[in-house]
């Protein structure tokens, strides 16, 4: 299990400070201008796979209510960035918020090894409750047999037809019915699913140690939590991250697993267009299994102004940089170089061991041709040898910080840095690679890798 929380935070109180209404207490997570649901799914998937070295998923499910593409399968970009086997099925499960927990439930009820990734970008009209309460993020779960950190005990689902939240094709924002309607419908569905899940797992309610409750309707989630009696209800992250919709059930499950003790029974309750309840028992391997806990990501944040948030979300249009926009990325070139572009895979000369970034057919140390081994570099850390701050290059969020990176074990590469200001960067700083969007032209997203400063303590 893993969760991904973007680096930036919006103080909800800033909304009222600018618009005179809206906002609230706490913060919400904000994806950077160079992130979308695909890149956040990649980040969550990378963290999940790092926690399970040697895992080879034979299926990938990607759930989101805000896909980067329609018609085109978004999971294929995630598949390529994670360097999964070409024989692994990659499919989207998107459109509805329930698809996140639905994809997870489907994987749990299936055989084989499945990687389920979910991500969402959530917003609303300026000053709306949706804008303030939403959040951006991703989650991932590697489901299979063998050594597990949490054993699936059973689950249950209840489905009902009612329209509490909707968004039509082409609409920018969701719309909702009056909150009390959902509050009156969801708790009964939740109770039905709760009782059925306990029966499926042959458990009594007092055997459950912790429960996480997710719903887009906060009032319904609150009523459900109270109805569970003495079970400990974990923090729903609403005060620090916000509601990440499709990704949120997985994010809460990851948070709950990260703090669990071996033997504890954990329950995930999701109230979205019905109710889903999943029950797990923390295994002995749960202690220290997380590569980068959600709590650590929540703590390592930087504030973002409300004006910048509105600009990044396209709610206001700023004067663009007085520079030519980058051209459209060639899909043919991208396909030919997909191992480099999506997986950040260089080449290493067999004779000399010299690393080539980008990959080359002829080594710079000799004249040997096509005598190379693949060199995956996405998970290799690097040191900033030098850097520059470019105020002239085109960027939706200038200035750009470019660094020369020296990778551990050899290899040097000039690279853009992200999730930082010019004052944050120093020669000698340690960085890691992150999958981002370089730009979008004619509806084609140009994905590649940037560097970001390693969190303190890593």
What residue spans do the PLM features occupy?
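OB-fold/S1-family single-stranded nucleic acid-binding modules
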Residues: 434-458
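Short nucleic-acid-contacting surface segments enriched for D/E, G, S/T with interspersed K/R
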Residues: 419-433
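Short aromatic-glycine-enriched beta-strand elements
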Residues: 392-404, 445-448
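Condensing-enzyme catalytic core mediating Claisen C-C bond formation in acyl metabolism
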Residues: 1-37, 128-184, 188, 261, ...
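Phosphate/pyrophosphate-binding loops at sites that engage ATP/ADP/AMP, CoA/4′-phosphopantetheine
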Residues: 44-58, 191-209, 228-229, 414
């Amino acid at each position: 299990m893993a969760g991904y929380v973007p680096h930036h935070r919006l103080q909800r109180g800033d909304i009222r400070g600018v618009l005179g209404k809206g906002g609230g207490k706490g913060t919400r997570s904000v994806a950077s201008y160079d992130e979308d649901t695909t890149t956040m799914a990649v980040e969550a998937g990378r963290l999940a796979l790092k926690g399970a070295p040697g895992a080879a998923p034979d299926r990938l499910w990607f759930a989101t209510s805000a896909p980067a593409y329609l018609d085109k399968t978004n999971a294929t970009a995630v598949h390529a960035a994670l360097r999964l086997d070409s024989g692994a099925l990659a499919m989207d499960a998107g459109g509805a918020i329930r698809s996140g927990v639905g994809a997870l439930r489907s994987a749990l009820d299936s055989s084989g090894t499945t990687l389920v990734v979910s991500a969402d970008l959530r917003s609303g009209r300026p000053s709306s409750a949706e804008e303030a309460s939403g959040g951006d993020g991703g989650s991932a779960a590697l489901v299979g047999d063998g050594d597990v950190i949490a054993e699936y005990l059973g689950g249950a689902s209840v489905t009902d037809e009612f329209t509490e939240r909707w968004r039509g094709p082409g609409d920018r924002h969701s719309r909702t019915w009056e909150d009390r309607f959902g509050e009156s419908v969801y708790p009964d569905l939740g109770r039905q699913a709760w009782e059925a899940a306990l029966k499926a797992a042959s458990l009594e309610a007092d055997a459950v140690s912790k429960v996480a409750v997710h719903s887009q309707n906060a009032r319904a989630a609150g009523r459900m939590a109270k109805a569970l009696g003495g079970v400990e209800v974990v923090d729903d992250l609403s005060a620090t991250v916000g509601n990440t919709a499709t990704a949120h059930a997985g994010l809460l499950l990851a948070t709950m697993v990260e703090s669990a003790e071996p033997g504890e029974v954990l329950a995930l309750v999701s109230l979205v267009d019905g109710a889903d309840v999943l029950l797990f028992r923390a295994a002995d391997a749960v202690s220290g299994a997380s590569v980068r806990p959600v709590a650590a990501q929540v703590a390592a944040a930087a504030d973002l102004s409300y004006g910048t948030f509105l600009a990044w979300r396209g709610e206001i249009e700023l004067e663009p940089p007085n520079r030519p926009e980058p051209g459209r990325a060639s899909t043919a070139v991208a396909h030919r170089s997909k191992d480099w572009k999506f997986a950040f895979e260089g080449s290493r000369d067999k004779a000399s061991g010299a690393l080539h970034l980008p990959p080359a057919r002829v080594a710079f140390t000799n004249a040997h041709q096509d005598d190379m081994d693949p060199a995956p570099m996405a998970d290799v850390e690097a040191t900033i040898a030098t850097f520059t701050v470019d105020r002239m290059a085109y960027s939706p969020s200038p200035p750009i910080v470019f660094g020369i990176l020296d990778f551990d074990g050899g290899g040097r590469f000039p690279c853009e840095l992200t999730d930082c200001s010019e004052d944050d960067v120093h020669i000698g700083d340690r960085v890691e690679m992150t999958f981002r969007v370089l730009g979008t032209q004619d509806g084609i997203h140009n994905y590649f890798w940037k560097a970001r400063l390693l969190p303190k303590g890593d």
